Amino acid sequence: MKKEKLRIENISFQYPGAATYALKDVSFSLYEGEWVSIIGQNGSGKSTLAKLLNGLFLPEAGTITVNDTMVLSEETVWDVRKQIGMVFQNPDNQFVGTTVQDDVVFGLENIGMPREQMIERLEQALQLVRMEDFLNDEPHSLSGGQKQRVAIAGVLALQPSILILDEATSMLDPQGRREVVETVRQLVTQKGITVLSITHDLEEAAQSDRVIILNKGEILEEGTPEKIFKSSHMLQEIGLDVPFSVKIAELLKRNEILLQNTHLTMESLVNELWRLHSKK
């Protein structure tokens, strides 16, 4: 059985002066080597959840537990932040070094890590995100996707238990989004890194292992991407869309082209269409 890395139990939070709760009785767990996506329209509670996980706010009720032992509180917030690494929305706002290597080692320098160990962590982190060839590059020479991969490397160098992506692809072009999503998938499948992605990008969510839908501060549904995106009517009712490949597959089925699988990527859909065509 996989180790539980993060446990959210019955958390609720209400902003001062607000008439309703931003989050109400939310519970879920995140396990080692798992990639979970949280989706929902604006006002669903996604941003509030990110702030709670980072310790910017504390829940009014319920608990947040990391590694089965550490409960988030005013006393433990700094220890929890060492275990949870966050990558945010704007890649330019996260780049603090004059070169890629300066940026990645920034956090390591702040904790006084010995130089030899720092160099080892730097090399490992850049290899994980496939940016080792850009060691001395300046930020202005990098694409948005490359900057986010460097931001991920900076977090990984600190070796947190959990990587949280807070709308980390929302300001990127399609190529940049693909780069980051491919990097995250490799980190999960090849290195067993645990990832929580808070996103409005359904193409990104479709690549994760599990999807949780937040709606008006509560969990509406939870399951595999295949299960979630089959319910296109439910998603549309709460203001969400479905991945483009799912839309195309539904149109094909209406035209009596019988597909065997749920397709979350265009590549998967094209492959099945090719197989069907080859049988004719």
From Swiss-Prot:
<feature type="binding site">
    <location>
        <begin position="40"/>
        <end position="47"/>
    </location>
    <ligand>
        <name>ATP</name>
    </ligand>
</feature>
<feature type="domain" description="ABC transporter">
    <location>
        <begin position="6"/>
        <end position="241"/>
    </location>
</feature>
<dbReference type="GO" id="GO:0016887">
    <property type="term" value="F:ATP hydrolysis activity"/>
</dbReference>
<dbReference type="GO" id="GO:0042626">
    <property type="term" value="F:ATPase-coupled transmembrane transporter activity"/>
</dbReference>
<dbReference type="InterPro" id="IPR030947">
    <property type="entry name" value="EcfA_1"/>
</dbReference>
<keyword id="KW-0813">Transport</keyword>
<keyword id="KW-0067">ATP-binding</keyword>
<comment type="function">
    <text>ATP-binding (A) component of a common energy-coupling factor (ECF) ABC-transporter complex. Unlike classic ABC transporters this ECF transporter provides the energy necessary to transport a number of different substrates.</text>
</comment>
<keyword id="KW-0472">Membrane</keyword>
<keyword id="KW-1278">Translocase</keyword>
<comment type="subunit">
    <text>Forms a stable energy-coupling factor (ECF) transporter complex composed of 2 membrane-embedded substrate-binding proteins (S component), 2 ATP-binding proteins (A component) and 2 transmembrane proteins (T component).</text>
</comment>
<comment type="similarity">
    <text>Belongs to the ABC transporter superfamily. Energy-coupling factor EcfA family.</text>
</comment>
<keyword id="KW-1003">Cell membrane</keyword>
<dbReference type="InterPro" id="IPR015856">
    <property type="entry name" value="ABC_transpr_CbiO/EcfA_su"/>
</dbReference>
<keyword id="KW-0547">Nucleotide-binding</keyword>
<dbReference type="Pfam" id="PF00005">
    <property type="entry name" value="ABC_tran"/>
</dbReference>
<dbReference type="GO" id="GO:0043190">
    <property type="term" value="C:ATP-binding cassette (ABC) transporter complex"/>
</dbReference>
<dbReference type="InterPro" id="IPR003593">
    <property type="entry name" value="AAA+_ATPase"/>
</dbReference>
<dbReference type="InterPro" id="IPR027417">
    <property type="entry name" value="P-loop_NTPase"/>
</dbReference>
<dbReference type="InterPro" id="IPR003439">
    <property type="entry name" value="ABC_transporter-like_ATP-bd"/>
</dbReference>
<dbReference type="InterPro" id="IPR050095">
    <property type="entry name" value="ECF_ABC_transporter_ATP-bd"/>
</dbReference>
<protein>
    <recommendedName>
        <fullName>Energy-coupling factor transporter ATP-binding protein EcfA1</fullName>
        <ecNumber>7.-.-.-</ecNumber>
    </recommendedName>
</protein>
<dbReference type="GO" id="GO:0005524">
    <property type="term" value="F:ATP binding"/>
</dbReference>
<dbReference type="InterPro" id="IPR017871">
    <property type="entry name" value="ABC_transporter-like_CS"/>
</dbReference>
